[in-house]
From Swiss-Prot:
Keywords: Leucine-rich repeat, Repeat. Pfam families: F-box, LRR_At5g56370. This is Putative F-box/LRR-repeat protein At5g41840. Residues 13-61 form the F-box domain. Gene3D superfamilies: Ribonuclease Inhibitor (3.80.10.10).
Length: 540
């Protein structure tokens, strides 16, 4: 019988060094570049391998020691920028193709320095660029936006491009635009002329995901009215957001920016037959020339009036709403509710809408909800994000609101008014952030400041307890009115279990509910309670 030799591998055995260089480079490509560079001390053979790593991922949070962050302009701070330079210079000598170039910085000494890296990686045929720069330089009135290098708009290899400079960048497409392979484009905090945006999008024939966030229109030398067209047949996801933080925050120091002319003379067109997701946040433009989303499944609308429009001004967003009428899932912000309450024309019918989420605040009434719900014949799930309500003169009118109160000389008064809820086919009702309070509803008993919104109509609680009691009354009204409810879920915004118990007991005492069989569930971070009520209010 032949003896078998037992092979013992020591704990210190090096199995990685025996791997081919290409495989080691592949392994290193999954590490942050700082850590990949640190591996060169393991063996002489490893030192040149960093030059061939196809994925570069620079993160200053990994590079810096926490104490070094206290001095933004220390040598260690600038050494991060120099480290990126040295790695790019090392790889440039090998002319190795580059797949991914990611940079994430919270502290950058010079953002123009970051932009100088873009042409260098473009020469290497990079597929994926992601620059996430959240630091801010010192603001001054003469500051200007940095410009993206024009070469970035004629890349034959780019598949994914994400640019976020919190200081903002200026996009000026001097020559042509040709991005034949680009599928994902994210631009965040940027300024561009409307004509330049049209030119940019016209060169992205394969685009599937487009994010235009924190967008500012640059001054245009053109005399004719500005028109923006987002028409990309391949597009599947679109995020078009002009955030108030950008044009009302620190960025207004860069130029004299007139908030009253945010969208003056601007018209929009959307023609995207394969789009399935839309997020649109903006003040109302002059005109929506065309809105066509044939395949839309989900939409998130955050419409706002312009600063020079008051509550009584009529607006026309009918064409925009018609363009999304086939959506199945819809989210509406509180500002959008206000816009809908001022529509010149009727809200179109949303035949396919199954789930509707509504954000509420104490500053916006529910005037637009009855006509909206009447326009959703297939609605099954209704979600309130917060259950805040502003009492107006319409409360108490037939289909003037969803509450059971009227505003009687500045006080709430119960009134039995038949609303559209009595014919609602909604089966699931969810209340997110139940018990949430705003600053003017907090425990200090601060009065609501009505100077900014129709103080003649407004009536509000001045205590947290009162706010919760008011929200309980709304839930009771829903239970007593909605005939086919199967489930009501309250996500209570409280750390106290006794708060959940109190609300649960109040809902238990309902003498009757409209639905034959409805499950009521209250959940907080620590506790979840549920019960089933019959039409007579009996708990099962």
């Amino acid at each position: 019988m032949k003896s078998r030799k037992k092979v013992v591998v020591g704990v210190s055995g090096d199995r990685i060094s025996g791997l081919p260089d290409a495989l080691i480079c592949h392994i290193l490509s999954f590490l942050p570049t700082k850590e990949a560079a640190s591996t060169t001390v393991l063996a002489k053979r490893w030192k040149p391998l960093l030059a061939f790593v196809p994925n570069l991922n620079f993160d200053d949070s990994i590079y810096f020691h926490p104490r070094a962050r206290r001095n933004k302009y220390s040598k260690s701070y600038e050494s991060f920028m120099s480290f990126v330079d040295s790695v790019l210079a090392l790889q440039a000598k090998t002319k190795t193709p580059l797949k991914r170039f990611h940079v994430k910085c919270e502290d950058v000494v010079d953002q123009s320095w970051v932009l100088e890296w873009i042409p260098k990686v473009l020469k290497r045929g990079v597929l994926d660029i992601d620059l996430h720069i959240t630091s801010s330089r010192n603001y001054c009135e003469n500051s200007s936006f940095y410009s993206l290098p024009s070469k970035i708009f004629v890349s034959k290899t780019l598949v994914r491009l994400k640019i976020q400079f919190q200081d903002g960048v200026h996009i000026d497409v001097e020559g042509g635009v040709s991005l034949p392979k680009l599928k994902t484009l994210h631009l965040d905090y940027f300024k561009i002329e409307t004509s330049m945006l049209n030119k940019l999008l016209s060169g992205c024939h394969a685009l599937e995901e487009l994010v235009l966030a924190n967008l500012m229109w640059a001054d245009s030398s053109e005399d004719e009215a500005c028109h923006v067209s987002v028409s990309i047949p391949t597009l599947k996801r679109l995020n078009f957001c002009r955030s108030e933080d950008f044009y009302e925050g620190e960025f207004h120091f860069y130029e004299d920016y007139d908030e009253e002319n945010i969208n003056e003379g601007v018209s929009l067109s959307f023609d995207n037959p394969n789009l399935v997701y839309l997020e649109y946040s903006d003040v109302i433009v002059d005109k929506y020339k065309q809105v066509s989303f044939d395949s839309l499944v989900e939409a998130n609308l955050r419409l706002r009036k312009t600063p020079d429009q008051d509550e009584t001004d009529k607006v026309n967003v009918t064409k925009l709403l018609m363009g999304i009428h086939n959506v199945k899932i819809l989210y509406l912000s509180d500002d959008t509710l206000e816009v809908l309450s001022c529509c010149r024309e009727r809200i179109p019918v949303f035949d396919n809408l199954l789930e509707l989420t509504i954000k509420t605040t104490p500053y916006v009434g529910w005037k637009s909800l009855p006509p909206l719900l009447k326009s959703c014949p297939s609605l099954e799930t209704l979600v309130f994000e917060g259950l805040h309500h502003k009492y107006t003169k319409r409360c108490g009118d037939k289909d003037g609101c969803l509450c059971k109160y009227e505003n009687h000389w500045g006080t709430k008064k119960k009134k039995n008014v038949r609303t559209c809820l009595s014919s609602s086919l909604v089966k699931v009702l969810k209340i997110l952030k139940f018990g949430e309070t705003f600053e003017d509803e907090n425990e200090d008993g601060l009065d609501v400041d009505h100077d900014d919104y129709d103080d003649e109509d407004a009536v509000s609680c001045d205590e947290v307890g009162g706010v919760v009691e008011e929200q309980i009354e709304h839930v009771k009204h829903f239970l007593e009115t909605m005939p086919v409810l199967k489930q009501v879920i309250l996500y209570y915004n409280t750390p106290k279990d006794e708060d959940v118990m109190k609300v649960f007991k109040k809902l238990e005492k309902l003498p009757r509910v409209a639905s034959a069989n409805c499950n009521v569930q209250i959940s907080s971070k620590n506790l979840s309670l549920s019960s089933t009520s019959t039409k007579r209010g009996t708990l099962l």
